Regions:
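Domain-terminus/edge residues, biased toward the C-terminal soluble/receptor-binding domains
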Residues: 18, 22, 33-256
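Short, small-residue-biased leader/transition segments that mark boundaries at the very start
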Residues: 2-5
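Glycine-rich, acidic and aromatic/proline-enriched surface loops and short helix-turn segments
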Residues: 10-19
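Conserved short loop/turn motifs at secondary-structure junctions
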Residues: 27-33
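Generic structural signal for hydrophobic residues
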Residues: 8-9, 82
């Protein structure tokens, strides 16, 4: 297993686009020219970790923890302190991992959250731990001051869409996802305008999940992006007897 794990790690690295990384062991302590990575690749790996397993931040954000070490000779309590000093020294820092070797020097992959943004800062090759954390804090400061995000948390209610030749007269609609727009370079997002684009009517059959239209987001006349509007339920095409029944209903109700 010890020999097989680096093979799997290298395969996974390729899947993540870590093209400048090669693992020769599973602990990262090999002092070899064939065992290497880059800050960009560490950032890709870290992003994959916190996106797939966000609960890791519940643990990496702990500054101190009381641990009980149990052996055959008995148990002994001791205090475990986080090696990531940014947890206590930088507001919003919630992780992630420090590391150091004689060849790599002092390294850290740090995560911080502020104003609905999550930032990753990776530092490698620092001469000491103070420089490592100072550089990471500077990267955070630059990132948070340069970026802002718009999230549409107050989505407008969607109308029901008229359906022709369907067993139902209308179709339910729903948003495909929550709209988010990231502005970089210090750009300030102005007032956002939303426009719902839908046809006046559609013909059955309709399948749940198919695209019905979209919502377009603009600020200062520039389009920020859009989100698809999907059908929220199936609408089957009406048969002859369905149409006959509908006609008779309209006749007796005086709407035909």
């Amino acid at each position: 297993l010890h020999d097989a794990l680096p093979i799997w790690m290298n395969q996974k690295a390729k899947e993540l686009g870590m093209n400048d990384t090669k693992f020769e062991d599973c602990c990262g302590l090999t002092d070899s020219d064939g065992h290497y990575t880059t800050a960009a690749d560490v950032a890709k790996m870290s992003r994959e970790l916190i996106e797939r397993f966000p609960q890791i931040l519940n643990y990496s954000s702990i500054w101190m923890e009381e641990i009980t070490h149990v052996t055959q000779k008995g148990s002994k309590p001791f205090t475990l302190t986080n090696t990531n000093k940014l947890i206590r020294g930088y507001e919003g820092c919630v992780g992630l991992k420090t590391g150091s070797t004689s060849k790599a020097k002092y390294c850290v992959s740090a995560v911080a959250k502020k104003n609905d943004l999550t930032m990753l800062a990776v530092v490698m090759g620092a001469p000491d731990y103070k420089v490592r954390f100072a550089d990471a804090a500077s990267l955070f400061q630059y990132g948070f001051s340069s970026c802002s995000i718009y999230i549409d948390r107050e989505r407008d209610p969607l109308p029901e869409l008229s359906v022709v030749y369907g067993k139902q007269d209308t179709a339910e609609l729903e948003y495909a996802e929550e709209f988010r727009y990231l502005a970089t370079g210090g750009t300030v997002i102005g007032e956002v305008e939303k426009t719902i684009e839908l046809p006046e009517e559609v013909q059955a059959p309709i399948q749940k999940g198919e695209c019905a239209g979209r919502v377009v987001y603009k600020a200062d006349g520039e389009e920020l992006g859009s989100v698809a509007i999907l059908y929220g339920a199936d609408v089957a095409r009406a048969g002859m007897w369905d149409l006959f029944g509908c006609t008779m209903k309209q006749y007796f109700l005086g709407t035909a």
